[in-house]
Amino acid sequence: MRKTLLFSVSSVTLWQNSRVPDIRRIALYFVAVLGLGALLAPWLYWGGTWLGGAMPSLEFLQRVTFQRYFNRAMLVAAVALLWPLAKSLHVRSWSDLGLSPNPAWRRDVGLGFALACGLLFALGAVLLVAGLYDWRQGLKWTDLPNAAVSAAAVSILEESLFRGALLGVVLRTAGAWPAQNFVAALFAIVHFLKPPENTTPLLASLGSIHWLSGFELLPKVFWQFSDPWLLLGGFLTLFVVGLTLGLITRATHSLWSAIGLHAGWVFGLKTFSALTAPTRAHLLPWVGQNLLIGLGPLVTVALTAAILFWFRPRETPTPRA
């Protein structure tokens, strides 16, 4: 009886002291984001269409598809649940996650942005010269400010979540490389979850939007995993992106280089997509319908990482004790 009790107490103590519950809380966080996002999506859709009808300056909101409201709802849910996640993990400051203040943050953001955006535009120029992409008839110059705002918001939010909170927490449990690979894979999986772009059949299957429409759309976000070319060209590129961002974060003990890189990739992707269009439907495996998919983007991201780590300034801030 005494041995059994001692074993039970020891097991409980070991369980409480281990970091395994951290991983479970992170998994629960992502499940909760999917559930809350699906619940919020119809309300965002109704609110957006109402605002579009009530305010002429916001009329464009009535033309936004339910899929885009669904994506934004997931983003809202991720932000809303981030604070409870941090509290449950007993994270009080960035130093608890191995991050330190970076006095050279402007330099790191600027270099990361210029390198990522510059090489992505270089890839775009090659695709234009090769005839795989062409300039749009009506250039969407008005999309450029939106691309800049989106790049800033997405990079700060996602780097705070993935390379800040998640990578810092997983490193408590696993070694450096297992943690980096796990978070990079998670980053790629999350970005691979999106509804199909072919809206007509999808909207027909959904019918009129009701408060459970988000849950009806939720199973359809996994469609890209059934396409082997998309899985190879898209998922692998996203994985290398996530791995690069994670490695530079731990090398500098700061998020700013990763934020600059991420913002450069988002701005380059959205700008090129606004100004050009593919000349044919099937370009895989070399390139897809945007600069995120294909072996060409994969090589470009890998080259960006190699240049960054080779030439980056070595005077980086050190973590606090």
Q: Would you name each region that the model predicts?
A:
Residues M1-W94, G98-P101, W105, C117, ...:
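N-terminal, membrane-interfacial amphipathic/helix-forming hydrophobic leader that caps
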Residues V129-L161, A165-L166:
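Hydrophobic alpha-helical segments and helix pairs
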Residues L157-H210, R250-S254:
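Membrane-interface helix/loop boundary segments of multi-pass membrane proteins
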Residues L217:
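Catalytic-adjacent loop/helix segments of enzymes that bind and process anionic phosphate/sulfate esters
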Residues V109, F113, C117, A148, ...:
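Residue-level signature of the transmembrane alpha-helical core
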Residues L144, A148-V149, W177, N181, ...:
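The feature captures the transmembrane alpha-helix scaffold of multi-pass secondary transporters
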Residues L97, E159, A258-I259:
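Alpha-helix N-cap/helix-start motif at helix boundaries, enriched for small hydrophobics
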Residues L99, F113, I156, A165, ...:
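Gly/Ser/Thr-rich helix-start
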